[in-house]
């Protein structure tokens, strides 16, 4: 998606752009796939940074302006309401920051002044600065907040939605998440990520971007300090003045003709995820009375955000119910949907023989469904199972197969390159490893890097 946004931005100013996509569906990590008659979103639990129409100076309004997209074209529908659940406590995330402040005051009365001071401090940071604000957010929270449970409850959603670091998140990324999750909020187009991709593809066609699908890059040819050509999977050589790569920083290095295929091993991300998707008969699903949009949960005393030693860590994760957005009168999804995400071990999943791999997908589908239902209004197993219409699971192995991201690391390398620069003067990193994450972040990444490296000369 960062590549689509960069292509649109560059082509708007008359630059000739070739957009190469390894797969047959656009969007990369923020895409969709079809199975049967259903289209499954990949990545999009919510489009973050939602603000009411008319709000100015926000990431959402910036990207709409820079891509010349009208807000109504996105068809954004705000969430009904989300929760952080841990240690028997709950905090609301419902697109109203004041409600979160009130919950902190009620649940952690001794910490409310500290929380307000923390908000003031984070709000003073320029979270989108391309220099970035290094350092540990966990250390920052240890310094600013005395209650360990409150610290963990704030790390829980920000890590799951934006950190490539184990057991921490960089301060600049934490500031981005603070704004996008807590101070602004969640929304979703009625048809999901396809709406965003459709708009970007329309803009690509409008500005004559040359798009080639199922056309991966085999090698980046390097001479001296420049990338001079691309060798495509079919052997075609393409020459270019500048290259913007959303393949990942390490993955991009390993494509270079002057680098070893094993370069930068220590910079590969370790955090993989498993996600289960279940669909339900709509009438039955409505009777479940599951009202939350997203639930960030942790069932342990302390929040551990690290690659598990076993296949999956079911003790913390994210529950998403895409039905629970305010779609407007007369509009509802055709089926009920339940998505559950948890940390998973890439290497352990890749070691499994095919038959055991399929068995374990079914096993963890059932286990995570049970975990999620422990955080939702109870329903009998027979009622639940009778309403079920389909299931699917993707693992770190799935992510690596279809995206090429090493270790199936959705958030990429823990080493981000905020200015997008590499040691080559005309090769730039966009997307996850530039440092802006999620759907909104991906588009802003493409826009920012196109502006900085392609339009300022």
Walk through the language-model features, giving the residues of each.
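Helical element adjacent to the flavin cofactor pocket in flavoenzyme catalytic cores
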Residues: 174-231
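Rossmann-like flavin
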Residues: 86-171
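General small-molecule cofactor/ligand-binding pocket signal
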Residues: 72-75, 210-212, 428
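C-terminal segments that line or cap access tunnels to active or ligand-binding sites in enzymes
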Residues: 282-391
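A glycine-rich dinucleotide-binding beta-alpha-beta segment and adjacent secondary-structure elements
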Residues: 151-164, 318-319, 377-436
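N-terminal glycine-rich phosphate/pyrophosphate-binding loop and immediately adjacent elements
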Residues: 1-113
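A conserved FAD-binding loop/helix module that cradles the flavin
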Residues: 44, 432-454
